[in-house]
């Protein structure tokens, strides 16, 4: 009996979840599905430039598992580009990383989703409603 898949830690959920070749009606396009953890593997390795060991550590998987996820993602992207297919980002076995935050005003410690760490997002303290908090 197969072991259930372990959830991979993901720091980023893409806002745009669908790409398609220009000039082809949606009804005529076949799709390739990229899981959220495959998108995360591409982001960490190819965009952030981390080593495979650093990527595996961030995603809380072994290095060989990370390599399999990355290879699968790259193959799917290549297939979509070469064969003119759309890319859809959805699904998978993942958990959204949490960021530990401490309120400057009252000292309360709380968690927010990791993707809210960007400079334009606000992290309000649930105790005093202050938004000046640190990671």
Curated annotation (Swiss-Prot):
Coiled coil location:
none
Q: Name one Pfam family in it.
A: DUF134
| Domain of life of the source | Bacteria
**Similarity comment text for this entry:** Belongs to the UPF0251 family.
Q: What is this protein called?
A: UPF0251 protein Hore_18270
Organism (species):
Halothermothrix orenii (strain H 168 / OCM 544 / DSM 9562)
């Amino acid at each position: 009996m197969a072991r259930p898949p372990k959830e991979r830690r993901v720091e980023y959920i893409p806002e745009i979840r669908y790409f398609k070749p220009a000039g082809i009606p949606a009804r005529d396009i076949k799709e390739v599905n990229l899981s959220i953890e495959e998108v995360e593997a591409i982001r960490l390795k190819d965009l952030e430039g981390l080593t495979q060991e650093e990527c595996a550590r961030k995603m809380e998987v072994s290095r060989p598992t990370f390599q399999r996820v990355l290879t699968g993602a790259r193959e799917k992207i290549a297939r979509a580009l070469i064969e003119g297919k759309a890319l859809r980002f959805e699904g998978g076995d993942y958990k959204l990383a949490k960021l530990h935050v401490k309120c400057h005003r009252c000292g309360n410690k709380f968690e927010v989703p990791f993707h809210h760490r960007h400079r334009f997002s606000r992290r309000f303290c649930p105790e005093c409603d202050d938004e000046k908090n640190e990671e």
